[in-house]
Regions:
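Divalent cation-coordinating acidic motifs and surrounding scaffolds
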Residues: 47-128, 135-402, 418-438
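A short beta-strand micro-motif common to beta-rich folds, especially ectodomain repeats
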Residues: 407-420
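Extracellular calcium-associated, cysteine-rich motifs in secreted modular proteins
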Residues: 1-60
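Cysteine-rich, disulfide-stabilized extracellular repeat modules
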Residues: 5, 17-20, 27, 39-40, ...
Length: 438
């Protein structure tokens, strides 16, 4: 027998590479000797493996059990993409707010953007200890209070039916600064902040022909679907809808509009002042009601609502964004994505994918839910960014891919999908079919 341990590596080659010809995994790192050589790692040194670089490998020899029997896969969510849509009260008392944001928005967005370290990667393990591997495949310095890719947009409004989407979320903060120009010059004075939020969510709620809704994306605003979508409510006014429109205004409540936001996974960051108060209630009532209705809250139930001023609005915007990046609970679940150009499809070999907390440091899986109705809990609710959460992936027998003279591989990525913010982490997976020694 030229291959005593039946791992696809001839005994003579095992000896030449410092391996045990009677042990298919000489260094006990769960990667077979033949597969380590094919992947360029050292089969005699446990610290040299694909797992050490964050790539998870399972061997599926033809008509034999999987090795290891399952993979325990950790992922760690961080907000990658975020859209901050500045919904601006355009009345005269807000002029200084506009000028403050025009002066500092570009710098604020830069401060909120994670620093790209300029290194390509497939997993966090390939980055420095203070960094993680972004979904785009770059090592980024991760403070837990930044996002990799931030878009901004601007709306202006004053009274009912004056909402205008000046610029939808896009990648240039400088373009949003230009969209802020001329702010504080709106013709109305009886502000309708709740109605403005309703228009941002659904343009059909506005009767004006100037609303300029986006042609694509989420809501009239045009949020990216694969981003944390943040309606940033900025006003110094309470509900002052004109008496002539009282019946129509009554159709739009902060809690009700917030619920419409929740149905589209739009979150609310409220920056309010109380300097222009008349009409009904307070500016806080609207700011907090939108946040409550949209379920934009921390684990303790508190909302991202800040009383501000024109001198503080820029700092409060940054603080609110940073706290959302670190304190907004996420609902996350895994999604397998096949990679092309290999020996077959990965998905058919998986028999179970289930939440698992047995790896060191993994969050409890007690509250995991069965989001895809397959009988196994895989969806974690209430996960804070940066938490380590884990799954167990089990495999059936490989009866379809025969061995060749060289190792064969099937590749896939396990994306971590957040209901609130799209893809928030990923992991590269490999099925390895060991070769057959002639």
């Amino acid at each position: 027998d030229r291959d005593s341990d039946n791992d696809g590596l001839a005994d003579i080659d095992e000896a030449a590479n410092g391996c045990d010809p009677l042990d298919f995994d000489s260094d006990d790192d769960e990667e077979w000797d033949s597969i380590e050589l094919a992947l360029g790692t050292d089969p005699a040194v446990a610290s040299s493996s694909s797992r050490a670089t964050g790539v998870y490998v399972v061997q599926l020899p033809h008509n034999r059990p999987a090795s290891p029997a399952n993979l325990k896969i950790p992922l760690r969510p961080f907000v990658e993409n975020a859209d901050f849509y500045l919904s601006m009260d355009n009345t005269g008392s807000m002029t200084t707010y506009f000028s403050t944001l025009q002066t500092g928005l570009v710098t604020a967005v830069q401060a909120l953007t994670c620093t790209d370290l300029g290194t390509s990667c497939d997993a966090d393990e390939q980055c420095p200890s203070n960094a993680n591997c972004s979904v785009a495949g770059h090592c980024v310095a991760q403070t837990g209070q930044c996002a990799v890719n931030i878009y901004t947009g601007v709306a202006k409004w004053d009274t009912i039916d004056t909402f205008v989407n000046v610029i939808s979320p896009q990648s240039s903060a400088a373009s949003s600064v230009l969209a802020l120009a001329g702010g504080g010059t709106g013709g109305g004075y009886e502000e309708a902040p709740t109605h403005a939020a309703a228009c941002a969510v659904d343009g059909s709620k506005c009767l004006n022909n100037t609303k300029n809704c986006a042609a694509s994306g989420v809501g009239c605003v045009g949020f990216r679907s694969d981003a944390l979508k943040v309606y940033t409510h900025i006003t110094d006014a309470n509900e002052q809808c004109p008496m002539s429109q009282a019946a129509r205004c009554a159709m739009f409540t902060p809690l009700g509009v917030g619920a419409e936001m929740l149905s589209r996974q739009i979150k609310v960051l409220s920056l309010y002042d109380e300097q222009d108060i008349s009409g009904t209630g307070t500016a806080f009532d609207v700011a907090d009601g939108l946040a409550l209705g949209s379920a934009t809250q921390r684990a303790d139930g508190s909302r991202f609502v800040y009383q501000t001023s024109y001198t503080a609005v820029l700092n409060d915007l940054k603080t609110g964004a940073q706290q959302m990046f670190s304190q907004l609970p996420l609902t996350v679940s895994p999604l397998l994505r096949e990679e092309s150009g290999d020996a077959g499809a990965f998905g058919p070999f998986i028999t179970r994918l289930v939440a698992d907390s047995t790896l060191a440091g993994c969050s409890s899986a007690t509250n995991a839910a069965d989001g895809d109705n397959d009988g196994d809990p895989e969806t974690y609710p209430g996960v804070l960014p940066g938490s380590k959460i884990c799954w167990r992936m089990e495999f059936g027998t490989n009866a379809t891919i025969s061995p060749g003279t060289a190792a064969k591989f099937v590749r896939a990525r396990l994306d971590l999908r957040s209901r609130e913010a799209g893809t928030v982490d990923r992991r590269l997976l490999l099925i390895a079919i060991p070769p057959q020694v002639p």
